[in-house]
């Protein structure tokens, strides 16, 4: 019990969406970010995520991995990732913003050296969002990259 208490204390904010798989992805990525001196903020306003769990986990895993990697590449003094998730009518909206080097949002490709083995994350997000009858937009402004994903039920 003592060890569990220490783990809960170490994780400054535990995410609860009502979907344990989604919660696990967000909490694990948050713990990783915090352990690399990246502030990780959650603004979750859903009680249950009744959408395709595998699809949402694929989207979140890739988007949060991209956000962490972008933060690690920047020289900014304060690095952060903010994830917001809420429902509006029959839509699930996911917004992620993070510190980033400049990005051409019209040409999102990998910045890694081994390009053939990378760059699949954004393509996976695109395909998964489309398969869930949704859409997404990306924006870069003054040191911050953001992605907004809208999924229809």
Describe each model-derived feature in a short phrase.
Residues 90-120:
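Glycine-rich/acidic phosphate-handling loop/turn and adjacent ATP-lid/helix
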Residues 78-90:
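Short beta-strand/loop element within the Bergerat-fold HATPase_c
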Residues 14, 40-60:
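Conserved short strand/loop->alpha-helix "switch" segment adjacent to the catalytic nucleotide/phosphoryl-transfer site
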Residues 102, 141-148:
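Glycine-rich nucleotide-binding loop
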Residues 132-143:
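Glycine-rich ATP-binding loops of the HATPase_c
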Residues 53-76:
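Conserved ATP-binding N-box helix of the HATPase_c
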Residues 2-6, 10, 18-34:
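Short beta-to-alpha transition helix within the HATPase_c
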């Amino acid at each position: 019990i003592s060890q569990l208490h220490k783990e809960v204390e170490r994780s400054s904010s535990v995410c609860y969406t009502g979907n344990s798989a989604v919660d696990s992805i967000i909490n694990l990525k948050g713990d990783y970010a915090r352990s690399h001196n990246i502030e990780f903020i959650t603004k979750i306003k859903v009680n249950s995520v009744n959408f395709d769990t595998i699809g949402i986990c694929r989207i979140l895993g890739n988007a949060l991995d991209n956000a962490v990697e972008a933060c690690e590449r920047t020289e900014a003094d304060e690095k952060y990732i903010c994830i917001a998730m809420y429902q509006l009518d029959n839509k699930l909206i996911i917004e992620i913003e993070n510190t980033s080097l400049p990005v051409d949002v019209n040409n999102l490709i990998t910045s890694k050296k081994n390009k053939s083995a990378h760059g699949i994350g954004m393509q996976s997000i695109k395909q998964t969002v489309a398969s869930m009858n949704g859409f997404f937009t990306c924006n870069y402004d003054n040191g911050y990259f953001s992605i907004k994903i809208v999924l229809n039920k």
